[in-house]
């Protein structure tokens, strides 16, 4: 089950947990209200026939998917890719990830610009909304295999911060000010 907490401000090894002292955890409902990030539990061993995933794909129009493995052995240009993933950025489309194996962290900004760390493991599916500042890193296991979902042809174009003038960012801020009440939650 996914865990979420407020991060400390240490700039040591990004793969560590980085809890505040004392630790400050968030419930999934609070994560959604603060960030619009959605979470679903999926049977990773039988994801092709998982009803929740099938429903999500139909309702959200996810017509393309692929798989990516992040490890030193499997990812070409590993060090530079991890650096790019951990650079704070946003996307014009939502980012949908199903964890098939391994673990890692998605960090997202809340409405007060604090970092929230989301630990993802096998069976976790998260949807990072378009326009939210975020980043990704592996944990100390240094391995994750994920299924990525897209509406149409895949576009993974990061827009590094600052990108506040982009339409997707303005739309995100509007939804955030409304606690994501009228957002896409399925």
Curated annotation (Swiss-Prot):
Coiled coil: none
Entry's cofactor comment: Binds either 1 Fe or Ni cation per monomer. Iron-binding promotes an acireductone dioxygenase reaction producing 2-keto-4-methylthiobutyrate, while nickel-binding promotes an acireductone dioxygenase reaction producing 3-(methylsulfanyl)propanoate.
Biological process terms in GO annotation: L-methionine salvage from methylthioadenosine; methionine biosynthetic process; methionine metabolic process; positive regulation of reproductive process
A Pfam family assignment: ARD
Disruption phenotype: Viable and fertile. Females display reduced fecundity under restricted dietary conditions of 10% yeast. Fecundity can be rescued by supplementing their diet with methionine.
Function: Catalyzes 2 different reactions between oxygen and the acireductone 1,2-dihydroxy-3-keto-5-methylthiopentene (DHK-MTPene) depending upon the metal bound in the active site. Fe-containing acireductone dioxygenase (Fe-ARD) produces formate and 2-keto-4-methylthiobutyrate (KMTB), the alpha-ketoacid precursor of methionine in the methionine recycle pathway. Ni-containing acireductone dioxygenase (Ni-ARD) produces methylthiopropionate, carbon monoxide and formate, and does not lie on the methionine recycle pathway.
Cited HAMAP family: Salvage_MtnD_euk
Protein name: Acireductone dioxygenase
Organism: Drosophila melanogaster
Gene: Adi1
